[in-house]
Amino acid sequence: IDGGALGTSLSDDGRWLHDNVHLLTSELQGVCEAFKAKQKMPLVRTANEAIIPRVIVLAEAYLAKTEYQFSDKNFASYVEAFQQQTVLKTKELWMLISALKLVLLERIVERGAQAIANPKQSYGVGVCVSSLRDTSQASWKDILEPLILHDHILRKDPAGAYARMDLETRDLYRNKVVEIAEYSDFSEMEVASEALTLARESQQRRERDPRVALRCSHIGYYLLAEGATSLHQRVGYTPPLRERISSFLRRYPDEFYLNSILLITLAMMSVVVLLLMDPQVSPGLTLFAMLALFLPCSQAAVQITNYLVTSLLRPQILPKLDLSEGVPDDCMTLVAVPSLLLDEEQVRRLVDDVEVRFLGNHDRNLHFALLTDLPDSRSEPREGDPLVDLCEELIEELNQKYAGHGMGSFLMLHRHRVYNPREKVWMGWERKRGKLMDLNRLLRNEYDSFPGKIGNLSILPQIRFVITLDSDTDLPRGSAQRMIGAIAHPLNQAIIDPEKNIVVAGYGILQPRVGVSVQSSGRSRLASIYSGETGFDIYTHAISDVYQDLYGEGIFAGKGIYEVDTVRQVLDRRFPRNALLSHDLIEGAYARAGLASDIEVIEDYPSHYSAYNR
């Protein structure tokens, strides 16, 4: 629409159309895409015998009653009153957004045509355009969540966790209810009620382990975890083909993963040999050629198998509690950064980085500590060191700077070097692993290996979780609270087998996704080639990971959050001294590490090949 089409001047209705043409175009495209998606929506027959989705009739009735003036409050009240007679499915509630826009667009077209035909008359186009804009800007999650009726049932969770979970996890639970209802004879309300009944029944059983009791009494246990089988049997759930394949793969992960790699490797080797080798070549030479092909073919087979796994299995999202308003007292956490003190510039940078992490994740129950050693020495070290004194002074300055702000505190815990007869040097016992083991003992008043201590030591016995980071690891805003919320969730709390003394359910350690900083990716040719996508994704979402999606466990890479008591019980004194060159993998196997791929930390990428190979 332009002024020339309507004469030299536009009417008020024409002006509304002219000024909002981009809004109308974009909303029309969005509505078309929404209704193109093939969804089974309840249909109704209108007065003129047309059969259309029920949500469109509901949207038309609401807008007609309000004279096409949208308000989130009266809309919620209208739908709530409607559901007292007829319960809407969850997908219908979400389709109401597009239905409202569709009805408004139809009315804008109708009134716009009238305005063009008779520009001197007012037809109220502006009211419809304003309502269309309001529907686009409305906070629909806040509007629609209270209208999901089976959500009210889930909030009766006997474990008391559902109402404290974050929005993404509540959506995960609700979508699971919708999926089960779609492939069973039960409605969404009935599926949620059966899950609640199972959770309440579990409370009648006496479990020796209180964590097992909490896990089984949580409604999510019957939606996402081992209890889902019981719920499926009760409601007569018939899973779709994709779900059957996923369940089969997760039930037999080793058989699928290892056999797939083996079969693909043998197939590739055989094809190459048959195509390139002369039939008259001796069997010995053929065997040698196949052995030479084994390594490259096996690597290709691993990549192909990984692709198959990530194509067949959806990314596994770990449920989380919502701690955005504050970390509770029973989840007090210490962010610990093990590091060596090398020179004055490096010490100042260490303390500056601790302050940056604090400012992005400050909370009264979140504290920050440097765990420090001095470099290895061939000779017996002397008492005192100016670098230690400098670090203590800088940590004290931080505590004074932020005192009285109602936030966490800063600590420095420094160890003396001890003689290692095997390495023949004076060094911090067991290096990084030793720092964390010594920290765990200090937190539980078992043994004090830190003669140098600065900060509020009274909080140490109350620490439940430790977030361990490397000195070059950034902790993006809010990521600490999300990690704590994940590991504190009832389905993620570690359950230890008393006989094997290993974690068999839940997780003792959670590893976030590790991204690469933009600055480090440009420091060398090696970093720019291998670092891939860099920077922090502010819309961090779950991504596929072969081991987490297939086995339900991730690979611990030394950065993440762990529960102090669990790690102490499972790992303390488990391995002989000076025996582990890389301790992260084996510790993650015993303590059961999980990957929270929708939480991200950022670190520097190695700038030279020797560092890359460590």
Residue ranges and their predicted role:
Residues 2, 25-35, 86, 104-112, ...:
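A structural signal for well-ordered alpha-helices, especially hydrophobic packing surfaces
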Residues 98-107, 244-306, 512-516, 556, ...:
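Alpha-helical bilayer-embedded segments of polytopic membrane proteins, i.e.
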Residues 51-93, 100-114:
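Active-site activation/catalytic loop segments of kinase-like enzymes and analogous catalytic loops
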Residues 18, 22-29, 101, 106, ...:
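Generic structural signal for well-ordered, non-transmembrane alpha-helical segments
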Residues 121-247, 316-614:
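Internal catalytic domains of large membrane-associated glycosyltransferases
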Residues 2-9, 81-85, 90, 149-157, ...:
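Short, charged/polar, low-complexity loop and linker segments
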Residues 305-319:
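Juxtamembrane helix-loop transition segments at the membrane interface in multi-pass membrane proteins
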Residues 5-73, 467, 473-478:
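Active-site acidic catalytic loop and adjacent metal/ATP-binding pocket
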